[in-house]
């Protein structure tokens, strides 16, 4: 499936790695990054509206959708640092050395890392429904870990997680599509089928992405924390109000990383770009204004 009116390219971003990207519109560039267990199609509504006056680039992340899925060899292939470098290379290859960056879920973690590693490239940053990796692990422990069991499952050494998920991939990925949504009609059957097909074919790389978040991504965040590195661009964060339910202050956690922060909560479910596209589009436009 494709976003209507957008053209598609496979763009090489690293040795042996190309990303599938939907591109539409003209104007100042915005890159939109999807999360788990989805593809660039999550942006079909938001991208169409933004493309009226922006160049909009919607890639499948490394390891997801129709993008390449390199084998993990040394623990870095799916680090957020590597995945962020992919996005900077993608934008540059398309003629955009600077751009606004929006990420949801896993894509927001890639966007967060891009903001820290490439502050001269990212003009504005929007993160949807995540906490920074270090804060995520601190917040989702103890009884809170029950709602995030997949983080712990996919953090295990290679072998068992992949085997368990591959044994019933549709059941595994459907569980999260059902659990995290408030308006099931926001993901029509054909879009859901596209997500399941793409995820079914990407079990190993999806697990590698999550495993990196329990290892090398934590190391990188700790290094930035120790060095006092922060996001230097304007940042907007939209989240469900998980903090009040699970006992953490999401706005305060984000403020520690983003001095120029606009934080808000939404009544939409996790898949807010599909459940509340007008709200998310307005958040993006307000930050860019």
Labelled PLM ranges:
Residues 21-23:
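Conserved hydrophobic "DFG−1" position in protein kinase catalytic cores
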Residues 2-10, 15, 19, 29, ...:
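Flexible "cap/lid" subdomain of the alpha/beta-hydrolase fold that forms the substrate-access gate
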Residues 36-46:
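The serine-hydrolase catalytic nucleophile loop
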Residues 28-34:
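Short beta-strand element of the alpha/beta-hydrolase
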Residues 35, 275-276:
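Active-site helix-initiating loop/hinge in glycosyltransferases
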Residues 34-36, 103-104:
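Conserved alpha/beta-hydrolase "nucleophile elbow" surrounding the catalytic nucleophile
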Residues 45-54, 93:
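A short, Lys/Arg-enriched amphipathic alpha-helix followed by its capping loop at the start of a domain
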